[in-house]
Each structure stands twice: as C-alpha cells, then as structure tokens.
C-alpha cells in the first residue's frame, strides 16, 4: 500500500520533470511510509527522488519500526540539516512542502550552494486527494458515527443549556463511540453567535426562538469526519425558516451536480448563485467546502476560484451558509464521496428544518 502511494507520487514528479522532493508534513510521511511521529520542533523529513530512493530522517528520540526505506538517525546535538544536505543533489531542483519551516529550509539552502527550491507539496497532496479503498471505508464508518453523535446531540439540547454544556456532551459521545479524538473543537453556536462561522462555545444560554448551529467531527483510525446541522429552539420566525430552507436546498443542488469532470468552482457557484437569487449572497461569507482525510482541512477546496475538476475517490464537504450579523446563522454540511458517475453523500441524518429543545 505505501509503496504504491510512493510510486504514484514519483510518477507525478516525472511528469513535471522534477527529480527530487522533501516531504515534511507528518501526515504525508505517514501516508507514504506508515511511520507515525509527532516531531514537535524537531526535523522530520522524507526524501524521494525520481529513481525511487527513499530516505527517512528521524531523531533518535523517536522509536519506530523499521520500514522499507533508508533511515538516517540524528540526535539533538547533531546538525540535522547537514545530514539532509548530504543526500540532496544540489544541481537539481528540490521540491519542498508548502508549510516547511524556515528554520530548516534556510540552513539547508546555505549548505547546498546553488540549490533551486520550488513548492513540491502538490505531488503528495494530489495523491492524498484520491482516497483508496481502505481510506474510504474509514471515512464512511466515521461519518456514520458522526450521524449518531449529531442525532444524540439534537435530542440532548434543551432550552436553558449553555453552549459549553452541549460541547461537553458532544466530546463524551465521541469517546463512547470509539473515536480517538475530535477532528476539530466542536462548534456549538446559539442565536447571534451563529453569525460567526467558527464561534467557539461559551457560556451563552439557549433561548426559545434561537438558531442552533452544530458543526462536529470525530477522528478514528487516523481519519476525520465533519458535518453541520442547524436547528431552532422550540420556535422560529418565518424568515428563519425561509433561510434554513434556502441553505438546505443550496446544499442539495450542489450535491446533485457532483460527478467526475465537473469543476469545483461550478459546484460552489451552484450553491452560491441559488443563495444570491434570494438576496442573501453577501451573507454567504466563505467557500462552499474543503477536502478532508487524515486532517479536517486537507489541500484542496470547493471554491469559486478553483477550476480543478472532480475525480473519483475525492472526499470533500458541501457546506453553504447564511450568516446575519447580530441575529443568527444557518449552515448545512455533508461530506461527499465522488464515484465513477456521481457522488455518495456520507451523512444520512435528516437536514430539513426542525425545532428542538
């Protein structure tokens, strides 16, 4: 499995004429080698070249099983970038990760005189974007768990509760259902707090008539889930009901057009234009979706500027929203898996307007 992924990355490198890359993102290194390390501030990198050479750079602080690649170990007192430089071909362009820290990159460039550096993340990112069978199984299972957590949360919420109480309940459910962690800190927003798409739970108390935005995800077997539902406490104004219906239909219209060959920007615009047709376009303040896998936000998005086309095996979110400042917010989010002729919506929990509490 790991060698197949490495081969796919090298094939992409060769197509662009790039002979070497340095992978430094821990999730990407795990994806290519099976080595799971949280390096903190220490160097952790995988060197790949177009001839199939694989060299893993590891601090002796970490204990890992031997893998199918060369290993170069170093201690905290060693000059780790000199060890990197000993492997890199300074006469050839080197691709590096988009987020690699300057504390390693700059010393490496100083040691490799004349080395040309380019962004090399896309070779791994594009490979990670197409999920294999095992990854898909994990993400389907995790989305099923997420549906259960959302349903339990919906049934738990009552008028007079605080956002923090709901957050604590959500965290406990993931533990009970076997998740090792959450994909991200749960978002639980009552009333006007819902106008902030990334509001963090506080001591706000739920009152009748308020919107309730719940955005949650769990992490199990390294893979993430993510979904959002919006409910209303006991009652809602006609305007709020209308807004919820607009957002829900925008979500469904976007999902309906997803199939291989469709541009990601056109998926975004399908939802965005529908919302705009009701006069709420300025209140849809973010892109339609993001890719997801080992991390909640992997490289790739569903935005009005992304002209890349959809491919089978991609998994991403569809999450339109309308946010009225100082009043309320509504967001409806599913994960979708692209198939050979369409897509499968991984979240099955009802997303129609509902009153709770």
Positions of PLM-derived features:
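Active-site neighborhoods and metal-handling regions in enzymes and metal-associated proteins
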Residues: 1-357
């Amino acid at each position: 499995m790991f060698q197949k992924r490495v081969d796919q990355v090298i094939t992409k490198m060769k197509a662009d004429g790039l002979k070497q890359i340095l992978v430094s993102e821990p999730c990407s290194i795990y994806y290519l080698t099976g080595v799971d390390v949280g390096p903190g501030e220490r160097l952790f990198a995988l060197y790949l070249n177009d001839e199939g050479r694989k060299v893993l750079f590891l601090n002796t602080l970490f204990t890992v099983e031997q893998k199918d690649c060369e290993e170069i170990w170093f201690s905290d007192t060693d000059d780790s970038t000199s060890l990197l430089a000993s492997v890199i071909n300074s006469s050839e362009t080197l691709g590096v990760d988009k987020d690699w820290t300057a504390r390693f990159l700059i010393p490496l460039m100083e040691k490799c005189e004349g080395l040309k550096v380019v962004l090399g993340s896309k070779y791994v990112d594009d490979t990670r974007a197409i999920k294999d069978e095992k990854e898909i199984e994990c993400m389907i299972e995790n989305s099923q768990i997420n549906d259960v957590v959302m349903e339990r949360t919906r049934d738990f919420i009552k008028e007079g509760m605080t956002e923090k109480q709901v957050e604590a309940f959500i965290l406990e459910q993931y533990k009970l259902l076997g998740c090792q962690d959450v994909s991200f800190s749960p978002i639980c927003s009552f009333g006007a707090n819902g106008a902030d798409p990334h509001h963090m739970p506080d001591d706000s108390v739920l009152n009748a008539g308020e919107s309730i935005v719940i955005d949650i995800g769990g992490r199990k077997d390294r893979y993430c889930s993510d979904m959002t539902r919006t409910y209303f406490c006991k009652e809602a104004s006609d305007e709020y009901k209308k807004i919820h219906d607009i957002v829900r239909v925008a979500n469904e219209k976007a999902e309906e057009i997803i199939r291989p060959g469709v541009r990601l920007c056109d998926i975004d615009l399908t939802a965005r234009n529908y919302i705009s047709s009701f006069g709420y376009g300025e209140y849809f303040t973010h892109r339609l979706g993001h890719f997801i896998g080992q991390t909640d936000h992997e490289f790739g998005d569903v935005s009005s500027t992304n002209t890349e086309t959809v491919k089978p095996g991609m998994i991403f979110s569809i999450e339109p929203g309308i946010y009225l400042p100082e009043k309320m917010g509504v967001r409806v989010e599913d994960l979708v898996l692209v198939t050979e002729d369409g897509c499968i919506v991984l979240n099955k929990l009802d997303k129609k307007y509902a009153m709770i509490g």
